[in-house]
Amino acid sequence: MRVKRGLASHRRHKKYLDAAKGFRGGRSKLYRTAREAVERSWMYAFRDRKVKKREFRKLWILRINAGARMHGLSYSKFMHGLTLAGISLNRKVLADLAVREKEDFAKLAQLAASKLN
């Protein structure tokens, strides 16, 4: 009996063309270029999920450093003072405090400075 494979390949093509919706030109219309574009976009997405973590950590450190320097401490001295004080807040929370809750961050900076001396 003759086996017709149109349905399987159609579904496979449709999967890539649906994923390429919103791409410009042939990248959303032609199967081969759409597949290449989609696979490349998946590579970028995988890579940038890793980069995102690094970028946010850099941003948090930058904000904590700015907040600490307003109280006469460097970032490293501030973090060391917090460790000596037994305070284990992560950088995300500390950065949020430095931006939104300046009074609370000032208390933490004061505590860190007192533990350093």
UniProtKB/Swiss-Prot annotation:
InterPro entries: Ribosomal_bL20, RIBOSOMAL_L20_CS, Ribosomal_protein_bL20_C
CDD domains in the cross-refs: Ribosomal_L20 (cd07026)
Annotated GO MF terms: rRNA binding; structural constituent of ribosome
This protein's record includes keyword Aminoacyl-tRNA synthetase: no
GO biological process: ribosomal large subunit assembly; translation
Transmembrane segment boundaries: none
Keyword Ribosomal protein: yes
GO cellular component, one term: ribosome
Keywords annotated in UniProt: Ribonucleoprotein, Ribosomal protein, RNA-binding, rRNA-binding
Role this protein plays: Binds directly to 23S ribosomal RNA and is necessary for the in vitro assembly process of the 50S ribosomal subunit. It is not involved in the protein synthesizing functions of that subunit.
Family recorded in the similarity comment: Belongs to the bacterial ribosomal protein bL20 family.
Name of the featured protein: Large ribosomal subunit protein bL20
Gene name tied to this protein: rplT
